[in-house]
Amino acid sequence: MASNDKGLEEIPEGQIETNYDEVTDSFDSMDLKPELLRGVYAYGFERPSAIQQRAIKPIIAGHDVIAQAQSGTGKTATFSISALQKIDQELKACQALIVAPTRELAQQIQKVVVAIGDFMNIECHACIGGTNVRDDMNALRAGPQVVVGTPGRIHDMIERRVLKTDQMKLFILDEADEMLSRGFTEQIYDIFQLLPQSTQVTLLSATMPQDVLEVTTKFMRDPIRILVKKQELTLEGIKQFYIAVEKEEWKLDTLSDLYETVTITQAVIFCNTRRKVDWLTDKLTARDFTVSAMHGDMEQGQRDVIMKEFRSGSSRVLIATDLLARGIDVQQVSLVINYDLPANRENYIHRIGRGGRFGRKGVAINFVTADDVRMMREIEQFYSTQIEEMPMNVADLI
């Protein structure tokens, strides 16, 4: 922490300028403790999101970091992983303090820290208003390594000398703009005054209004600034078709015919249930098609292997459920087949959409039974898009 006020005044309000561009694109390359890495994968992460690729390493390296990121970008895990890497598990004292604007958010952060730190010997306590003060004091006396809470209660506990700050390494402010706009400015400043001078500061905020910038100039030393825009998914550049399949039972033959017509470089086939994924995998394997399957019942290790094979191209067709639609990075996939139309329209874009900046072309083919027509029309309306009947020359388009 420092009173260093050069360098940030020029930043236009609303958006910071990134001054750091190092990217680490896998968790394996972050030099994390083995038991922490195990927790990261067990939590279900496969590869780091944009903010995780940029912010985890500088925080671990000891830099003050300002990250401008919306929720949904993976920011909670960013600072949770960083905090867990930095703490000494043997030392029963608060070493990382996380402050959030609401009780709900504080509890949510605590759950993430506990889950990712599952294989580590750590305690994380949520210190929030509306709970019994005595219980809080007892929990803090036990010396949890990570404490997360709302500004009022945290300040109170430091004042009472129950939350000790002498071993504090890292102070994290999540949703700083929210916190300051809710009138917590004074408490935040007071907390800063009570922390050791050497404490490293990480600040996360969706917007950068003047009061947030003031905190950064007053209390941060040469901060690394990282701006992460939330990636918008788009259906642009994706040709969307449907095949009218009168009955559910006819879908399998339709899929086999499609296989014969089209040379598939790589495809993902989505079904709505795990049972259907397994059934379809068995049926296609029996017809001598090589496919791999993936759904939420599988162990993380097994899913990693399947994903690796698929990414490297050694497996060409992946059959999956929606659970994985959001996690599969399928930029290289030329064909997505919705064997079942998604049960809700939001998942449609997660299955077939692409990040706008990649602008990859692709083809999506929807198998539509008589019962699905209404859902398909809803999807078209919701996304203002057109799904046309699949033409005979579909092979030329893939």
From Swiss-Prot:
InterPro entries the UniProt entry points to: DEAD/DEAH_box_helicase_dom, EIF4A_DEADc, Helicase_ATP-bd, Helicase_C-like, P-loop_NTPase, RNA-helicase_DEAD-box_CS, RNA_helicase_DEAD_Q_motif
The reaction(s) this protein catalyses: ATP + H2O = ADP + phosphate + H(+)
Annotated ranges, domain Helicase C-terminal: 237-398
Domain Helicase ATP-binding, residue spans: 56-226
Motif, DEAD box: chain positions: 174-177
UniProt enzyme class: hydrolase
Keywords, comma-separated and alphabetical: ATP-binding, Cytoplasm, Helicase, Hydrolase, Initiation factor, Nucleotide-binding, Protein biosynthesis, RNA-binding
Domain notes: The Q motif is unique to and characteristic of the DEAD box family of RNA helicases and controls ATP binding and hydrolysis.
Record's function text: ATP-dependent RNA helicase which is a subunit of the eIF4F complex involved in cap recognition and is required for mRNA binding to ribosome. In the current model of translation initiation, eIF4A unwinds RNA secondary structures in the 5'-UTR of mRNAs which is necessary to allow efficient binding of the small ribosomal subunit, and subsequent scanning for the initiator codon.
Annotated protein name in UniProt: ATP-dependent RNA helicase eIF4A
Annotated source species: Aspergillus niger (strain ATCC MYA-4892 / CBS 513.88 / FGSC A1513)
UniProt gene name: tif1
